[in-house]
Amino acid sequence: MKQKLTDLYAKNGTKKVLASLLSILAGLLLGSIVVIIVGLAEQKITTAGMWEGVRLIFAGILSTGRDAAGALTWGFNAQNVGNMLFRAMPLIMTGLSVAVAFKTGLFNIGAPGQYLMGTLVSLSVALGIPSESVPVGIIWLLAFLGGMLAGALWGAIPGLLKALLNINEVLACIMTNWIAANLVTWMFDISSFKNVTEGTKSGYIYKTTFNGVATPKLGLDQLFPGSQVNAGILVAIILAIVVYIIMEKTVFGYELKACGANRHAARYAGIPDKRNIVLSMAIAGALAGAGAALYWLSGNTEFYWNTYQALPGVGFNGIPVALLAVNNPIAVIFTGIFMAMLDIVGLQLTNLTAYNEYITDVIISVIVYLSAFSLLIQMMLTGRKKKLVVEANKTTTADIPAEAETPPLDVPPEDIPDIPMEEAPQVPEQPEEGGEQA
């Protein structure tokens, strides 16, 4: 049994999973410490309130509110779980966007800009095509594909600059992020799409249901009543599986990873490294654009364009999602859901305790920073793994009896035939220098 556990621990996949879990646990523990410190500094938060805050951090998704006596109640909260899945959609997609680029040796910090371009095109198509003349389902599909295409084209720009001019993709992505932010703001400012103005806001609110376009629920609203969840989460999961198959089971995925491992060696092996760099960033951009389309085409969300003079946080949150998943597309599904769970936990902290909504951002920030330590934890676990393997080998060697190490020779010496050695070939004598030649 001990040997089986040692073999399981020695696997590289086990080490990666443990590193991510330890990073998450450390983040939650530090987040709890932050909650306690804030509670001690805030007079209106009691000791009982601090304890409730810590409990909500670890199990807030299962909180159902308070009973008549004011105590927290626990159980399966379908609304919370549904909203968590809804918020996980864009996080899964931006996490995939960052992970695909990482696999090719690139750092796609341009996911926010690609997400914004997907927002611009998907909303423009959903609100611009009249639903009176075109079926709503066709409009939704065109808007979704348009968002993916816009993200792909925006992501290809840093890829081209990297492949052709060797410009660092991080600098190029930062540049395109702010161009996208201002472009989206300007385009919606001059647009004539159908909108509604709320008296408390100075900008315009856009919602795809104004044109009758919304992602179908497929019965998920009955499974999670009162929540915003729709079929978009299924699309996100399917896309994650498709990305996994492409990256792990196809020649194209192997070429992308080969370029990420060593671009120059891949080129010498005949792999078109420049083409793969551009395609990798384009695919990453398409995934980020798809995340924006799934979120804004849901029919539940209202796009307020004035807020996008800043970059959307969901694009940057894709980075810790990918890091915690160790760039594995399947693991991105779970880390994206985990990050969405933290959002729901923050709402529970705000609604059920005296903490304000900003405490959640602090906790998420702590976990984001600690996600970068997952690689360090992997290195520490690797050292531990080598030690366990050495100890296991010593134990295995010690269990071998001494007489079994050198088996006795049962054949009598006189029965061993003589094996004649081949005679060395005769080398003709060379005549002395200056002598006569034969």
Model-derived segments and their meaning:
Residues 1-27, 32, 36-37, 261, ...:
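Cytosolic-side transmembrane-helix boundaries in multi-pass membrane proteins
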